[in-house]
Amino acid sequence: RSSLVTGVQTCALPICPDSPSLRDIKRHEIAWSVDSQSTRPGYSAVAFFFARKVANHLGVPVGVIESSWGGKPIEGFIPSEEFETREALRPIAELVRNNKLKEVGALEGGVIIRNTAGMPGRIFNSRIAPVAPYAVAGAIWYQGESNAGKGEDPRNYRFKMQALVTGWRKVFRNPKLPFYFVQLPSYRDEAFGWIRLREEQRLSLSLPQTGMAVTIDLYDTDIHPANKIDVGERLALWPLSQQYGHSQRVCGGPLFKSAKVEGETMRIQFDFLGGGLMVATKEGAGPVTETPATDLQHFEIAGADAVWHPATAEIESEEVVVQSPSVSRPVAVRYACHGAPQNPNLYNRAGLPASPFCSNLAFLPWSVDPVSGGTR
């Protein structure tokens, strides 16, 4: 179908890491493409389905500039000056400045810098700075795998997200530039880094004018799930609701708000109720189906010893109440905090999945200890 039907036009930037910021891109290196069967194979499927949903609802064409680069950590996309002004990130800048790249991985929140593209600001300089201050309506972001793999420390990722969003808003001269991102999906049981990184992404929502598409229910053995439709369309709910006046649209699934201890139980409150909570299931790219006779899964509680135990969970009105016979004095609760939780089934009635969460970040493992083999 042509862009007159889908309403989508695309533009991809050339790949080349540069140390100083590029100020212009040669005309022959970049051009808008009308959506067609021939142009889609080389373009981001998530971006396409995002743009198509927005265009279909607004009735106007939507253009997307793709500035992605697969398999790269977030550091390369952040303006280098943002590292200098943030306490949590300054050690990275100092080591890179002194050409001690191998030592970056040993830092709290460290990352393996495999090539120059992973150095602070390098991808930003070549693929973001040349576009600014183009009058973009917002940004969508799908990344995190390369900050949560073997040898990477996902702690501090939320501070990197803050630096990313703030830096882009500065260069686009828009302090309220909407920024929507994808939370990492389900992947592998041993992917402890992904557990912590998903939580870091959830905590990044403290930034104003941001939104997160939850994908924990889109299980796939591939690091990049084949179901791009749900990812893109869930992202599209955010601008439709927050920017384009579709206030009746629910833009996200249930997000952890607070937890209250009541004797041997914990009562959990959520934002983004979307008409109420429900137990449901989703098979592949099919619709979400309510399953009221099924128990809620993947809730766990812990006492002061920080040992997690499976918990029974029940929906009571707009809250979830959890308890476990193994924990008489609970202090923390978590949901879907595994590398690949099978059938996480808490949704709102808009058909959107609840985000994984942990009420106490100190209790959440982030890697396998190389000495003991346990988690840390």
What are these regions (language model features)?
Residues 1-11:
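Single conserved hydrophobic/aromatic residue that forms the stacking wall/gate
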Residues 8, 58-63, 134-138, 174-180, ...:
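Loop/turn elements at helix/coil->beta-strand transitions in domains of secreted/extracellular proteins
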Residues 25-66, 71-73, 78:
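A conserved hydrophobic secondary-structure block that centers on an alpha-helix together
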Residues 48, 118-130, 159-167, 192-202:
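Alpha-helical scaffolding within the catalytic cores
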Residues 65, 184-216, 228:
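Substrate-gating cap/lid alpha-helix
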Residues 80-104:
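Acidic, His- and aromatic-enriched active-site or binding-groove loops in soluble protein domains
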Residues 230, 241-290:
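Surface beta-strand/loop "capping" patches
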Residues 267, 273-376:
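C-terminal beta-sandwich/jelly-roll accessory domains of carbohydrate-active enzymes
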